[in-house]
């Protein structure tokens, strides 16, 4: 009887042990099955973007000087069947600051990518200095567009603000009021982006959600300097306090 009990106990122990080993793979499989619908949507989005990339058209024109104006004329754009921009007409002119607002998925990033000619309208036309965007050589207009977001946060701070080493590290640190190191606070890092925008020689500046941790007095001072620069400044933000410094506000939900 004792031997039978030992066998039964050993069998039960092994049975429970192997069931426990199966638990994690089964849970992982279930999780992966639940993610299939969202993965499929992501895959469709990637394929749509690849298709968009392949349809870009370029010409031979060169950009002479700064970008003075940008016009979108009855632009339509969407991903597959999802229309993001419908009959969108906008005018951007140097010397003005434009606030771009709207919830996630409303088309803010799409609009920026269209202006940068990373996407191309499905209908309608985009003009740079009254010349069709697709008449310019590839990457020609990008020479005058400075996009500043938080996609560089893992880089060396000095490389972020001055990748071409035009200024000394000492000058930049004196201007900022703090030392450039790898332990910057969120506020210091975002102010670094603002400083980069102020130092840029390009004629179009796009600021994408870089204000949430910056002191309001510093933001006010930066926008005062932006006004003096006579450039096209496009500001993407959810901060209502920042919008008060813009000359006009573009609501993506109204387009």
Question: What are the roles of these predicted feature ranges?
Answer:
Residues 21-49:
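Cytosolic ends of transmembrane helices, especially the final helix of ABC transmembrane type-1 domains
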Residues 180, 209-210, 214-215:
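Walker B catalytic motif
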Residues 101-103:
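The feature captures the beta-strand-to-loop junction immediately N-terminal to the Walker
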Residues 124-132, 141:
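Conserved ABC transporter NBD signature motif
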Residues 199-203:
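A short, proline-enriched helix->beta-strand linker immediately N-terminal to the Walker B motif
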Residues 50-99, 132:
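Primarily ABC-family ATPase nucleotide-binding module
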Residues 116:
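Helix-to-loop junction immediately C-terminal to a conserved catalytic motif
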Residues 99, 190-197:
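ABC ATPase nucleotide-binding domain "signature" region
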